[in-house]
């Protein structure tokens, strides 16, 4: 059981490291997506 806990800790640490690398990219992609959606909405409203 102790070995399992150790493995879990190591897994969580590496997972956190991956998250730290991925999160900023995901946040940037999310912002870009939100902006393009907002732009599309604005264009649609102008066309009406």
Curated annotation (Swiss-Prot):
One of its GO terms (cellular component) is membrane. Keywords: Antibiotic, Antimicrobial, Cytolysis, Hemolysis, Membrane, Secreted, Target cell membrane, Target membrane, Toxin. Transmembrane segments: none annotated. It is found in: Secreted; Target cell membrane. It comes from the Eukaryota. GO terms for molecular function: toxin activity. GO terms for biological process: defense response to bacterium; killing of cells of another organism. Disrupts cell membranes, particularly those rich in phosphocholine, through formation of pores. Has antimicrobial activity, hemolytic activity and insecticidal activity. Belongs to the cationic peptide 02 (oxyopinin-2) family. This is M-oxotoxin-Ot1b. The lineage of its organism: Eukaryota, Metazoa, Ecdysozoa, Arthropoda, Chelicerata.
């Amino acid at each position: 059981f102790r070995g399992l806990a150790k493995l879990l800790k190591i897994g969580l640490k590496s997972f956190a490291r991956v998250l730290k690398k991925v999160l900023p990219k995901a946040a940037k992609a999310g912002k870009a997506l939100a902006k393009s959606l907002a732009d599309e909405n604005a264009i649609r409203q102008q066309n009406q």
